[in-house]
């Protein structure tokens, strides 16, 4: 099987490149020139990005199958028992919680990775990477817990304030309705 070849040259000073149609790769006549290394790196990046985008799309469809139970479990006729709406809402809640947990994990991993790199630059090389990783993860967990605690304190304080305001409004409402109903009947009656 003979492959058709085409020779490309961009200028007279650069080495010629050969495109082999069977493999769709550029092959340089001088294998270790700067242009050939640059082209190889560029095509590798292009191939990696194409491969990663196709794997992402495959993962997306696989995760959809996991959430929806595969293609063979779809019901054509709706259920008559009346519980299907509740089940769908419960599945929706579970999937949204699952997505939230996945998002938080990915954010934690990204922040942890950046923090580990920054701390390794600052700390001496004698410290083990496992110790640095443990310390960074612990500090990030404690920080996220303290932020969560502060957020919950704010929510609880707002809830307590709203509850107190509602009680005061009900107290004033009850007092106003009492005075409207009975008037001044509980005090001394003036002589007519």
Swiss-Prot record:
Keyword Repeat assigned: no
GO BP field: abscisic acid-activated signaling pathway; flower development; negative regulation of photomorphogenesis; positive gravitropism; positive regulation of lateral root development; positive regulation of long-day photoperiodism, flowering; regulation of abscisic acid-activated signaling pathway; regulation of anthocyanin biosynthetic process
Record motif Nuclear localization signal, residues: 43-50
Topology with respect to the bilayer: Multi-pass membrane protein
Entries under InterPro entries matching the protein: SHW1 (IPR039324)
Gene induction: Induced by white light (WL). Barely detectable in dark and in various wavelengths of light such as red light (RL), far red light (FR), and blue light (BL).
Transmembrane segments: 122-142, 159-179
Record-level GO cellular component terms: nuclear membrane; nucleus
Keyword Hydrolase: no
Residue pairs linked by disulfide bridges in the UniProt entry: none
Keywords from the UniProt entry: Abscisic acid signaling pathway, Flowering, Membrane, Nucleus, Transmembrane, Transmembrane helix
Annotated compartments: Nucleus membrane
Tissue occurrence: Expressed in young seedlings (e.g. hypocotyl and cotyledons) and in green tissues (e.g. leaves, stems, sepals, and young siliques).
Record region (Disordered): 70-92
Compositional bias per record (Acidic residues), positions renumbered to this chain: 77-92
Top-level taxon of origin: Eukaryota
Deletion phenotype: Short hypocotyl in dark with drastic reduction in apical hook curvature. Enhanced inhibition in hypocotyl elongation in white light (WL), especially at lower fluence rates. Delayed flowering under long-day conditions. Reduced lateral roots formation. Reduced chlorophyll accumulation and expression of light-regulated genes. Increase in the anthocyanin level in the dark. Reduced sensitivity to abscisic acid (ABA) leading to impaired ABA-mediated reduction of seed germination. The double mutant shw1 phyB exhibits a strongly reduced hypocotyl length in WL.
Function text: Negative regulator of photomorphogenesis modulating both light and abscisic acid (ABA) signaling pathways. Negatively regulates the light-mediated inhibition of hypocotyl elongation, probably in a PHYB-mediated signaling pathway, but promotes flowering time (especially in long days) and lateral root formation. Enhances light-regulated gene expression. Promotes COP1-mediated degradation of HY5 during seedling development (e.g. hypocotyl growth) through enhanced ubiquitination in the darkness. Also involved in root gravitropism.
The protein's assembly and partners: Interacts with HY5 and COP1 in the nucleus.
Protein name in the entry: Protein SHORT HYPOCOTYL IN WHITE LIGHT 1
Source organism per UniProt: Arabidopsis thaliana (Mouse-ear cress)
């Amino acid at each position: 099987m003979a492959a058709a070849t085409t020779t490309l040259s961009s200028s007279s000073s650069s080495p010629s490149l050969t495109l082999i149609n069977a493999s769709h790769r550029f092959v340089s006549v001088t294998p270790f020139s700067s242009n050939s290394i640059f082209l190889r790196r560029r095509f590798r990046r292009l191939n990696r990005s194409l491969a990663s985008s196709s794997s992402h799309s495959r993962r997306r469809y696989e995760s959809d199958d996991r959430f929806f139970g595969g293609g063979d479990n779809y019901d054509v006729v709706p259920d008559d028992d009346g519980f299907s709406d509740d089940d769908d809402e419960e599945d929706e809640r579970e999937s949204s919680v699952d997505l939230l947990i996945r998002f938080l994990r990915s954010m934690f991993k990204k922040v942890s990775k950046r923090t580990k790199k920054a701390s390794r630059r600052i700390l001496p090389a004698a410290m083990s990477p496992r110790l640095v990783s443990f310390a960074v993860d612990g500090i990030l967990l404690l920080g996220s817990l303290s932020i969560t605690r502060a957020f919950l304190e704010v929510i609880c304080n707002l809830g307590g304030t709203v509850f107190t305001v509602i009680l005061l409004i009900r107290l004033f409402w009850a007092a106003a309705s009492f005075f409207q109903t009975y008037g001044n009947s509980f005090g001394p009656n003036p002589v007519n």
